[in-house]
Amino acid sequence: NMITPFVFRSLLDEGVLRDVEKVKKRIEEEHLRASFLNVKLGIGGIREIEFFVQTFQLLYGGGNKQLRLAGTLQVLQQLRQSELIPKQDADTLEKAYLFLRRVEHHLQLREEQQTHTLASNIVQQYAIARNLGYLEFEIEKALQHFLSDLKDVMGGVRAIFSGLFSSKHLEIEAAIH
């Protein structure tokens, strides 16, 4: 409770906004080097969803106590209910988060270690695809379906994350004045 006023400020200055934008740019630059095969740190991955959600917590958590939650999915639900982000974006991020976490968990179970990267080996990719329910008879079709879904999910996250400081999602200028 003592740190709440420092984390969830009732008023934000432009310096905080600039700092958040700098972090977003740094994440984007680092992700450009990462492959889409990394479901956590790659472009459109879990980290981008978490950063997106945490940015809204930082910006609006001071005035909206319902956003002061630890879970990404719970905060997404509150952002949807508070109409701070479009329902469609909240739905996309929620589905993507669940899908990417499932992929991540299957990767970690298969590798028996903490990993977030899908192997470039087709046999290993197919094994993950089958574990996730991509059960087409032909290996190539199952793998193609899984990789297509993965690209679509991560592309949807990326599109929303890229628009974080656009008028599509926030009237940030109004929030800090």
Regions found by a protein language model. Name each.
Residues 1-177:
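A nucleotide- and high-energy phosphate-metabolite-utilizing enzyme signature
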